[in-house]
Amino acid sequence: MALRLRHAALLAGLWLASGVAPAGGLQVSPVSLTLAASQNAEGLWLSNTGDNGVNAQVRVYRWTQEGAEDKLTPSRGLVISPPMLQLAAGDRQLVRAIRLGAPPSGPGAAQEAYRMIIDELPVDTAGKKGVQFVLRYSVPVFVEPAGAAAAPAQLSWAIRREGDKPMLEVANSGGTHAQLANLSFTDAAGHRTELTPGLLGYVLPGAQMRWALKPAAKVFAGGGTLETMVNGQTVQQKISLVDSPR
């Protein structure tokens, strides 16, 4: 059964600045993984910096993007070890993503994308009052193809008017994911509008994603320059508002 991944961008954005995912007593580091074609496994650390024990479950899903939405399906390419763990206060545990079979290969082979879903599970709270918060984290995992390096992300951009709502469309025809962050727009008169501080989201190879922008469509009517961080590098793109086909 497929899972929709609507919360992942928010979680990743919270982690982006520090490189560590905080969750009360539970911390995750690093917050993304990449397996080279020569690697069979890569790992991250789960740490408990709280005063009480933590139980966690770790699963992995194949991550694709269809119809401008993130989609998770059961993974046949990676497995997790260990999938269940208990961490006493002050403990940490290495959790590995292990590749099954060969990496992507062949002419034009692209990265494969996965998500590690880390759930903090309820613990025995007998005798304790208050609400127990149980959290979920989503960590991107990328598997590089064998042979020649995957083609870098190749992005095309558009801002489309849907009523008075502007929608940003980004398509990636390259073989590598694009992580988008810190989006801003500067109009022809030099007025700058911050659109998305922190992480906007990802565009996987061969996929197209769409995001609603908060300003009214008229802000973009005269065209201007879109600036964003793409995989940590500042990119500027001339852009104008277009009407969606009816």
Residue spans of the language-model regions?
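Bacterial N-terminal signal peptides that target proteins for export
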Residues: 1-10
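N-terminal signal peptide c-region/cleavage motif recognized by signal peptidases
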Residues: 17-20
